[in-house]
């Protein structure tokens, strides 16, 4: 795991097309802004896991889940 230190207003790059900007820090919460191409899915971890569980349930029932919806 790469660990970086950024201050509010500073940005980091992931590859050539994804930027993550620290928008603000209040207590133990950090607000980040993410710019990425539309084909790159960006989710909070807990939402990502829900989507994955939904896909597993859809596969086991023989139907396809709606994992393409925006959350």
From Swiss-Prot:
GO terms of molecular function: mRNA 5'-UTR binding
GO biological process, one term: mRNA catabolic process
Recorded superkingdom: Bacteria
Localization (cell): Cytoplasm
SUPFAM superfamilies for this protein: CsrA-like
UniProt GO cellular component terms: cytosol
Assigned keywords, A-Z: Activator, Cytoplasm, Repressor, RNA-binding, Translation regulation
One Pfam match: CsrA
Family matches, as NCBIfam families: csrA, PRK01712.1
Complex and partners: Homodimer; the beta-strands of each monomer intercalate to form a hydrophobic core, while the alpha-helices form wings that extend away from the core.
Similarity comment: family membership: Belongs to the CsrA/RsmA family.
Function: A key translational regulator that binds mRNA to regulate translation initiation and/or mRNA stability. Mediates global changes in gene expression, shifting from rapid growth to stress survival by linking envelope stress, the stringent response and the catabolite repression systems. Usually binds in the 5'-UTR; binding at or near the Shine-Dalgarno sequence prevents ribosome-binding, repressing translation, binding elsewhere in the 5'-UTR can activate translation and/or stabilize the mRNA. Its function is antagonized by small RNA(s).
Official protein name in the record: Translational regulator CsrA
Organism listed in the record: Xylella fastidiosa (strain Temecula1 / ATCC 700964)
Organism lineage: Bacteria, Pseudomonadati, Pseudomonadota, Gammaproteobacteria, Lysobacterales
This protein's encoding gene: csrA
């Amino acid at each position: 795991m790469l660990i970086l230190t950024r201050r509010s207003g500073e940005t980091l790059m992931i590859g050539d097309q994804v930027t993550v900007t620290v928008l603000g820090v209040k207590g133990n919460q950090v607000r980040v802004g993410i710019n990425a191409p539309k084909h790159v899915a960006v989710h909070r971890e807990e939402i990502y896991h829900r989507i994955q569980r939904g896909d597993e349930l859809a596969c086991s029932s023989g139907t396809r889940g709606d994992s393409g919806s925006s959350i």
